[in-house]
Amino acid sequence: MTRREVREVTFMMLFQLEFRQDISIEDTLAQYYTIDIESTDEEENLPKVKLSESDRNYIQTIVDGVIKNKSELDGIISLYAKGWTLERIIKVDLSVLRYCIYEMKYMSEETPLAVSINEAVEISKKYGTEKSKSFVNGVLSSYYKALKGAN
């Protein structure tokens, strides 16, 4: 799988976990282990992907990190989503923002910040509303400037 496809699966897992706190991360990840991202299973409506061990480790790291640092990530989102409360942000955008901010904050050695932002914007275009792209890009660009200013 490409890194973009892995990011997309990561987003889908986080989005699913937003609504299903009753299932474990491991069970959620297991649902994604066997199929192809271009096809969907009508019954479960989940993309089916073939994940390598490296892909699973990457996804597990991001998902665990987002869950463990959710309060901190939400604080960052609240700071840079001017005029928006977390409750008003659609769940697609919120999941994308949490995922990307985690990657920017904790994994910038592995992924350049601009790449993280671009990938997040592409995912928001695909799964969000027509305004998602601009909203996600605005929040992440503001956070990017703050990170660059701190260095």
Where are these regions (language model features)?
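N-terminal interaction/assembly modules
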Residues: M1-K133, N137-N151
